[in-house]
Design a protein with these regions (language model features):
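Asparagine-centered strand-capping/turn motif at beta-strand->loop junctions
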Residues: 65-69
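Short aromatic-acidic-glycine turn motif
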Residues: 82-93
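N-terminal edge beta-strand
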Residues: 34-62
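Extended, solvent-exposed segments with strong compositional bias
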Residues: 99-116
């Protein structure tokens, strides 16, 4: 399935609004079938507010991201220092520190916007090889706490 959208990307200028066209490819397949549309890895966003994914992902390529939860999620992929663990990340969030985490690195990151329950998308990216963390900062619909603070993060290696 291919949908083509045209939308204004800036307000009106001297010659009128500026428009851009983008294409979105989706699937008519049931997103709960356990398979991605391509041959690449699958990352699942779960109702337990966790990521289920391979520990190693490609540094460049396409992954299928499936929201198998009953709530919305999104995913950011951010670089962290080699050797960083999920336990360290959780300890930092639990500390409620107001400084940049000591394990975070400046560098390119990618992500996707909100994905509704039962939906999937193909995320294509190119990042330097290294250690990264997957995180979701959607606020919990009951507590208001960001999902990442509740444990929705996963350290992965991009090769």
């Amino acid at each position: 399935m291919l949908k083509v959208f045209t939308c204004p990307c800036r307000g009106p200028g001297p010659t009128g609004p500026k428009f851009t066209t983008f294409k979105v490819r989706g699937s008519d397949r049931d997103s709960a079938d356990g398979q991605g549309d391509g041959d690449g890895p699958v990352i699942r966003l779960t109702s337990a507010d966790r990521f289920v994914s391979p520990r190693t992902l490609p540094a460049r390529g396409t992954v299928t991201v499936k929201n198998v939860a009953d709530t919305i999620h999104f995913m950011a992929i951010s670089p962290v220092k080699k050797g960083t663990t999920d336990k360290q990340i959780q300890a930092f969030f639990d500390s409620k520190a107001q400084v940049q985490p000591p394990f975070f690195l400046n560098g390119p990151s990618v992500g996707m916007d909100v994905l509704s329950p039962g939906r999937q998308l193909e995320l294509t990216y190119k990042l330097p090889a290294g250690t990264y963390v997957l995180m979701c900062f959607i606020a919990d619909d009951v507590t208001g706490m960001p999902h990442a603070f509740m444990g929705m993060h996963k350290v992965v290696i991009l090769k």
